C-alpha cells in the first residue's frame, strides 16, 4: 500500500514536474511572441520630450498596462531628431520623435522607405498662456531686442532643428540675415547656459528643463521666444513608418493608447509628486525646480489626447520654404494621421 502510494506519488511528482515545467516555459514563449516596437527618441529629456518619461522602467511597470502584453518597447536614445530620422530611413526604427525640420527634410528627400505619418503630439510652442522656446542673454547684456543681435554669436543645439528654424525666422522678421548678420553655433542644450555665463556666446536658446534650471540660478533674462516668430506650431511629435502602421496597426494603437493613458496619469493631481520625481530623476534637475514648471502653465502646451492638426504643422513648413531650407512647399494634411490614437480628435 505504501509502495503503491509511493509509486503514485512519483508518477504524480513527474506529472506535476512536467506540468510545472510547461507552466514555467509558457511565459518565455508568450514573451517571445509579443511584438516589438522600435522607438527612437529625439534627444530630449523630461518636459521637452515627455515621451521619455513614459519610457522609464517605473512607468512601463506601473502605468503602461499594455506594455509586455501587446507590445514591447525597444528604445534607442539619440542625440537629436536628425539622428532619429536617419534611423527611420535606415529601417532601424518604427516610431520616432521628430522635430518639424527633421520631418520635413526626410519627406523632401523621400528618405523613409514607404513613407511616414505624424501620429501623435508631443508639445507645441507659441500657445498663449503656456511656456515657449526662449532665447536668453546675460542680465547686464546690451542686447535688449532682436535687432540688437546683429554681429553677435547665438547658440542652438544643432543646425536644422526646430529652435534653429525659430531663430532664423525671428531674425529675418526683424531685418537681420541669419547667414551674414549673426554667427550661429552648435552647443548641446545642457551646455548653453554655461556658454552664455562664460561669454563664449552672446545669446542662446534654453528650452525646458534647461531654461528653468538656469533661471533659478539668476543672471539671465529673455530676449525673445517662439511666439515672436511663429503662430502656434508643433515643435516635436511622434511619427511612425507607414510600413509599420500597415503591418502592425494593433501594436501602434496599443502603444499610443498607453502613451495617452500615461500622459493623463502624469497630469492627474494625485500623481503629481511621483510625476515630478520621475521628471527630476530623468533630467537630473532639482525636484523643486521641476515642480516650479512641470505640467503647469509654466510648461509647454500638450494636447491631453495627443491630438495634433495639420494647422499646427503647416506654419513651420512654410517658414522653411521662406528660409530656403525647403525647395518646394509641403502640404501637411496628407502626412497627419491621428486615427491610431485611442479617441477621435476633433476636426
Residue ranges and their predicted role:
Residues 1-8, 19-22:
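N-terminal secretory signal peptides
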Residues 4-14, 27:
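Twin-arginine (Tat) signal peptide motif
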Residues 28-32:
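Sec/Tat signal peptide C-region and signal peptidase I cleavage site
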Residues 33-177, 183-186, 202-208, 232:
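Short, glycine-/small- and polar/acidic-enriched structural segments
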Residues 84, 99-102, 145, 163-166, ...:
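Stable alpha-helical elements in mature extracytoplasmic
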Residues 190-281:
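Pocket-lining segment of extracytoplasmic ligand-binding domains
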Residues 246-327:
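Secondary-structure end/capping motifs
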Residues 317-347:
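Conserved C-terminal helix/tail region of periplasmic/extracytoplasmic solute-binding proteins
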Amino acid at each position: 500500500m505504501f509502495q503503491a502510494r509511493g509509486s503514485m506519488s512519483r508518477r504524480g511528482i513527474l506529472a506535476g514536474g512536467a506540468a510545472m515545467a510547461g507552466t514555467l516555459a509558457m511565459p518565455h514563449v508568450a514573451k517571445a511572441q509579443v511584438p516589438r516596437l522600435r522607438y527612437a527618441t529625439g534627444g530630449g529629456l523630461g518636459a521637452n520630450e515627455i515621451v521619455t518619461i513614459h519610457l522609464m522602467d517605473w512607468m512601463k511597470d506601473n502605468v503602461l498596462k499594455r506594455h509586455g502584453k501587446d507590445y514591447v518597447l525597444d528604445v534607442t536614445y539619440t542625440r537629436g531628431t536628425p539622428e532619429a530620422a536617419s534611423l527611420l530611413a535606415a529601417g532601424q526604427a518604427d516610431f520616432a520623435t521628430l522635430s518639424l525640420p527633421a520631418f520635413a527634410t526626410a519627406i523632401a528627400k523621400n528618405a523613409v522607405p514607404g513613407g511616414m505619418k505624424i501620429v501623435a503630439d508631443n508639445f507645441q510652442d507659441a500657445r498663449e498662456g503656456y511656456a515657449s522656446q526662449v532665447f536668453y542673454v546675460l542680465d547686464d547684456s546690451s542686447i535688449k531686442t532682436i535687432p540688437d543681435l546683429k554681429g553677435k554669436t547665438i547658440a542652438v543645439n544643432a543646425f536644422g532643428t526646430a529652435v534653429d528654424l525659430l531663430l532664423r525666422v525671428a531674425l529675418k522678421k526683424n531685418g537681420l540675415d541669419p547667414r551674414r548678420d549673426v554667427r550661429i553655433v552648435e552647443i548641446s542644450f545642457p551646455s548653453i547656459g554655461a556658454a552664455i555665463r562664460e561669454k563664449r556666446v552672446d545669446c542662446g536658446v534654453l528650452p525646458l528643463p534647461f531654461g528653468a534650471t538656469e533661471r533659478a540660478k539668476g543672471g539671465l533674462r529673455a530676449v525673445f521666444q517662439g511666439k515672436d516668430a511663429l503662430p502656434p506650431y508643433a515643435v516635436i511629435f511622434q511619427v511612425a513608418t507607414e510600413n509599420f502602421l500597415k503591418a502592425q496597426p494593433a501594436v501602434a494603437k496599443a502603444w499610443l493608447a498607453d502613451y495617452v493613458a500615461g500622459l493623463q496619469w502624469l497630469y492627474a493631481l494625485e500623481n503629481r509628486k511621483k510625476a515630478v520625481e520621475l521628471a527630476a530623476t530623468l533630467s537630473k534637475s532639482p525636484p523643486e525646480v521641476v515642480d516650479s514648471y512641470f505640467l503647469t502653465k509654466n510648461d509647454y502646451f500638450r494636447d491631453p489626447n495627443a491630438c495634433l492638426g495639420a494647422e499646427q504643422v503647416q506654419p513651420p513648413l512654410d517658414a522653411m520654404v521662406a528660409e530656403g531650407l525647403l525647395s518646394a512647399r509641403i502640404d501637411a494634411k496628407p502626412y497627419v494621421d491621428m486615427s491610431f490614437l485611442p479617441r477621435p480628435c476633433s476636426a
